[in-house]
Amino acid sequence: ALTDDQGAEFRNRSIGFVFQFHHLLPEFTAVENVMMPLLIGRHDREEAYEVASKILGEVGLSDRLDHKPGELSGGEQQRVAVARALVRRPLVVLADEPSGNLDRGKNGQALLDMIWDLSRTLRLAFVVVTHDEEIGRRADRMVRLIDGHLVELNQEVTV
């Protein structure tokens, strides 16, 4: 078993998290928010800035690096949250209703399109939790939680 510190380091290094609400720190800029996992992982500040800037460019926010969350739209805030989840190049990203805080139209769809594109280009697994069947159908694999069991195509999935 891992100690609490080892578990925290493992999560920070290997798992990215995207929540329904972005959970950005309001007093920090977009690039500073994305730098956080790197700084916590004891990366050099200059290197962290460079890596965070690059990943923000990958999510279409290279012109918004120095904006604080309150100066960003909801869709931009959520893209910063996705960039933060990706900044350490994790093995997997867990996304809990990532578009749930956005309108179902253009912004929500654009975020989901970006997640699917990033999954393919970075060859990275995203585990997306959603109540929206339409979103689930876009996934490579869909499982349901029924009575406490994960079920896929009428077969129980081993986790």
Where are these regions (language model features)?
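Conserved beta-strand-loop-alpha-helix hinge in the C-terminal portion
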Residues: 109, 149-159
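ABC family nucleotide-binding domain
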Residues: 1-138, 142-146
